[in-house]
Structure formats: structure tokens, C-alpha cells
């Protein structure tokens, strides 16, 4: 199949505090070559899930939920260290938002944050976390200002107004779709069908 000349951009809303978002990030990462062949580019948008749901910063992740997340990760073949509590991810997400105009830097930052939390079992709230993450990502970033944190609030409010009620959520033709985490082939089929509809491809009979 010939790769489309113009990429189809798909917004994905996420929160670094969400283990489900981490698993989705890893599944979509494995699908990178297939998505590129389909001409699909993912745009990752950080939002503060605690501002629009019942989750509260500092709230413990109970043992039953932790076991369920770890079982899901095993089914997907992804190693994960589930955080013990819902951490304050706003500063890390504010840095991601500040890097919007430098996509390669934003991608490196996002990957470094995911790895810090879900591979190294580190807390985003521990002293010096952002500085060490930046060092690992080979980036120079300043601590987020009050304005940068307010930008996350603004983006979260805008996403909520657009119908986003959780993460991860894909925005397809202005319609928010929260499909949760799926196996690779299911996720790929979901995005393949959307791309076909968007481009007017009737697909196989």
C-alpha cells in the first residue's frame, strides 16, 4: 500500500499518572511502523485527569487495582511498575506542553517520563525528578512556571468541553473516543478503519 503523502493527525489525550496511558503509549509505540505506513501521526496532549474525574492526587492505588493493571500489562507483554499512589503529574505535563514546538524534544521528554515512573518505579514528586528526567532525555528544561501550569489547566478544561472524560482518549473528527487499552491488532484495526473512513477508502468487500 502506498503511504499517503499527507499524514492523518490523531490527537491522543493522556496523563503521566495513568498506568493505562503508559500501556497505551507502549502498544502504540510497537505499532509505529504500521501507523507510519497508514500515514497516521499521533499528537499527544497532556491533561490533568484529577481535574475532571474522581481521582485525587495522593490517593493510593489499591491492591486489587494494582493487580489488575499488572495482569493487563502481562497480557500485553509489557513490564510495568505500577505507582503506589496517584502522583501529581502536572509539572511534568507542563514541560511536555512547553515542548510542543519541538516535536523531537517533546517525544524524548515523554519517553523519559514514562520510563522514570513505570520502568524505574520513581515518583514525579520526589526532589530533583524533573531535572534528572531532563538529563536522561538530554534536554535543558526550566522548571515550569505558574503560567505553564495554568496552560495545563486550560488544556484540560478545553478537552473536557470537547467531551473528553478520561484517558487515554483519541479525538477522531472532533469526536472523543475512549477505547482504553487494547491488544496491538485491535488497536491497529481501530486506527486503520478510522483512516480508511477519513480518506474515503471503502476497504475490502
Language-model region placement:
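Structural alpha/beta surface segment adjacent to cysteine/selenocysteine redox centers
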Residues: 16, 20-117, 202
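C-terminal cap of thioredoxin/glutaredoxin-like
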Residues: 3, 8-14, 20-38, 108, ...
Amino acid at each position: 500500500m502506498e503511504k499517503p503523502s499527507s499524514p492523518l493527525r490523531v490527537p491522543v489525550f493522556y496523563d503521566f499518572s495513568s498506568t493505562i496511558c503508559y500501556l497505551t503509549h507502549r502498544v502504540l509505540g510497537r505499532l509505529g511502523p504500521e501507523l507510519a505506513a497508514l500515514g497516521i501521526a499521533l499528537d499527544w496532549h497532556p491533561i490533568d485527569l484529577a481535574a475532571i474525574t474522581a481521582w485525587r492526587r495522593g490517593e493510593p492505588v489499591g491492591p486489587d487495582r494494582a493487580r489488575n493493571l499488572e495482569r493487563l500489562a502481562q497480557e500485553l507483554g509489557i513490564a510495568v511498575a505500577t505507582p503506589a499512589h496517584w502522583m501529581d503529574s502536572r509539572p511534568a505535563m507542563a514541560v511536555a506542553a512547553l515542548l510542543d514546538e519541538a516535536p523531537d524534544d517533546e517525544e524524548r521528554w515523554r519517553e523519559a517520563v514514562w520510563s522514570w515512573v513505570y520502568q524505574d518505579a520513581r515518583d514525579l514528586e520526589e526532589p530533583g525528578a524533573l531535572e534528572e528526567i531532563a538529563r536522561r532525555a538530554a534536554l535543558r528544561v526550566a522548571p515550569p512556571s505558574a503560567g505553564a501550569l495554568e496552560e495545563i489547566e486550560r488544556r484540560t478544561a478545553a478537552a473536557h468541553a470537547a467531551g473528553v472524560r478520561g484517558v487515554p482518549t483519541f479525538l477522531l473528527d472532533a469526536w472523543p473516543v475512549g477505547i482504553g487499552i487494547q491488544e496491538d491488532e485491535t488497536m491497529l484495526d481501530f486506527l486503520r478503519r478510522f483512516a480508511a473512513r477519513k480518506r474515503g477508502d471503502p476497504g475490502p468487500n
